[in-house]
Amino acid sequence: MKFAVLGAGSWGTALAMQLSRNDATVLWGRNKAGMEAMQKNRSNEQYLPGIKFPEKLIIDADLVHAIEQSEAVLVVCPSHAFGDILQQVKPLLGHRPLAWASKGFEPGTGRFLHEVADEILGDAVPMALVTGPSFAKDVAMNKPTLVAVASANKHKEFAKQVSLALRTDNFKAYLSEDLMGAELGGAVKNVLALATGIADGMELGDNTRAALMTRGMAEMMRLGDALGCKPETLMGLSGLGDLVLTSTGDLSRNRRMGLALGRGQTIDEAKQTIGQVVEGIGTTDEVMRLAQKYKVEMPITEHVWKVVHGELTTVEALSDLMGRDLKPEFG
């Protein structure tokens, strides 16, 4: 299946490279000059310097032409741009199915991205999500990686096609029919990675990181239960797997943001240092809205939110969390 990958950042480029190891794949991006440079260099020097493209990767700065060449579309963009991209794609899609590899919620509304896609495209369009523990650089360098491809039950055949299109000796995509659970895990882990990053930036030690990841996972599970997600989804690649990677790997933007905050930088200073979108900042607002709506206790998430919004310092947040009343670990 020939894909058009829409979004030429690090993750979009890496997924386009992975797909093109099997079949011709088109990579589209908004920045015409940037796309021309990619075509000339046969690499994405801005985000993945020095990693050469496979021969079957086609660079195209024309959205209409990119989609016309394809049999399916894969959207890879920040969550805040997801709806806008789908509006552009809608009149061009025809009978093509659509997948996405974006994580987070629609800013302001807190809607899951599959809800945004259903509203714009209609639920008759086959759709699937690619998610899980996968740094772009490792995928681009063809290092062994496992992800999940999630879809609604009625679209499971398309999810299987996506999985097969991505499959190589070093890349495997497991199938899931718990789309909401897969989306939730991929979003909440960004908030928890901020927490572990803050703790590591404060040099609180390995015990603290382990505690935050474990108790943070409990928060994810409680919210998932309230939303009707399958617990095994959150304990799998799209939940626990992604949490482990994002909370411990220094390629994670959310972890690096947390590290910067823990070392005393402001949000604006940290954003400038990282230079790319940090999904966890906006996602914190949306996870808090969900927690309040469903009356789910999420103290780590709440304290990250307070730090991000300047209501607490990192030291105050730590003291507040450690001072919480003693209670059973489970229940």
Report residues per predicted region.
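NAD(P)-dependent Rossmann-like dehydrogenase/reductase catalytic/cofactor-binding core
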Residues: 196-200, 225-235, 239, 243-331
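NAD(P)+-binding Rossmann beta1-loop-alpha1 motif at the extreme N-terminus of oxidoreductases
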Residues: 1-51, 58-61, 88
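General beta-strand structural signal in soluble alpha/beta enzymes
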Residues: 100, 126-131, 173-177, 236, ...
